[in-house]
Design a protein with these regions (language model features):
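Active-site beta->alpha N-cap acidic-glycine motif
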Residues: 1-83, 89, 96, 100-103, ...
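Domain-start "cap" segments at the beginnings of catalytic or binding domains
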Residues: 99-137
């Protein structure tokens, strides 16, 4: 898949033991505060790819994410599948989320803002239009925490097995993923912290 989709960030080339945790689909009050608590326990930093609708509903939690030293990034306003959405509608939805982020996050000129397409599904035309403005972030470790057929133990086992230095790991701060994520995240953090890894911002 990586070879078929050049021009996306799948992992970070790093020196030393560094990992990049990401959380998709929040923020929501039922789950995101738990994530922040676990990250704090291990002095870990993470990047949250937020749905704009949730940002608007729960801006107080988004502020907590920032205050805890983490980063907020764009995941569209309505969690759209690019393959099933028109070009104009998709770009407008990305911009709508970015407009909400701009009311929460202080502007910076250091790097491009980050965007992750929901489901990893985006057309070539959509990506080409977004790439001059955004860094398009994918992943090399998908925890599948949202999969109800996957046990929490197997979710953790598979996630650990696939992770290496520079990995971009996807968890979800969502109700759908809550069961597996609540089990896997603290144990994932403990495992790699004890191996000398640090968790950094994208």
């Amino acid at each position: 898949m990586k070879k078929l989709l050049p021009g996306y960030t799948w992992h970070r080339g790093v020196a030393g033991k560094k990992l990049f945790l990401t959380f998709d689909d929040g923020p929501i009050p039922e789950v995101t505060p738990f994530v922040l608590e676990q990250l704090a326990n291990y002095n870990a930093r993470a990047t949250f790819f937020c749905v704009g609708d949730n940002l608007e509903k729960h801006s107080d939690i988004a502020q907590q994410v920032l205050a805890s030293g983490h980063k907020l990034a764009n995941h569209t306003y309505n969690h759209l599948k690019g393959w099933q959405t028109s070009f104009d509608e998709y770009l407008q939805n990305v911009q709508q989320c970015q407009d909400i982020l701009a009311t929460i996050v202080s502007p910076t000129t250091e790097n491009k803002p980050l965007f992750r397409p929901p489901y990893g599904r985006i057309t070539t035309k959509q990506a080409t239009a977004l790439r001059p403005t955004y860094e398009l972030i994918m992943w090399d470790v998908l925890t599948n925490d949202y999969d109800a057929t996957l046990s929490p133990e197997e979710c953790l086992k598979q996630s650990i097995a696939k992770t290496q230095s520079g990995s971009i790991i996807v968890f979800h701060d969502s109700l759908k993923a809550e069961r597996n994520m609540r089990y896997a995240l603290p144990r994932f953090l403990e495992h790699f912290t004890h191996q000398g890894y640090t968790f950094e911002l994208l």
